[in-house]
Amino acid sequence: MKVRASVKKICDKCKVIHRRGVVRVICENSKHKQRQG
């Protein structure tokens, strides 16, 4: 899980989702997991 100021899709399988006001990226590749902090 990377915590970043700006979250972006890294590959085609990444999905940007909003969960309780937190922007997250979920992906099959666990290295691509991000959250906005």
Curated annotation (Swiss-Prot):
* Superkingdom in the source lineage: Bacteria
Which BP terms in the Gene Ontology apply to this protein? translation
List the record's Gene Ontology CC terms alphabetically.
Answer: cytoplasm; ribonucleoprotein complex; ribosome
InterPro entries (UniProt xref): Ribosomal_bL36, Ribosomal_bL36_sp
Cite the PROSITE patterns for this sequence.
Answer: RIBOSOMAL_L36
Q: Which SUPFAM superfamilies match?
A: Ribosomal protein L36 (SSF57840)
Q: Which UniProt keywords apply?
A: Ribonucleoprotein, Ribosomal protein
Gene Ontology molecular function: structural constituent of ribosome
What protein family does this chain belong to? Belongs to the bacterial ribosomal protein bL36 family.
Please state what the protein is called: Large ribosomal subunit protein bL36
Q: What organism does this protein naturally occur in?
A: Acidobacterium capsulatum (strain ATCC 51196 / DSM 11244 / BCRC 80197 / JCM 7670 / NBRC 15755 / NCIMB 13165 / 161)
Mind giving the lineage of the organism this protein is from? Bacteria, Pseudomonadati, Acidobacteriota, Terriglobia, Terriglobales
- Its gene is rpmJ
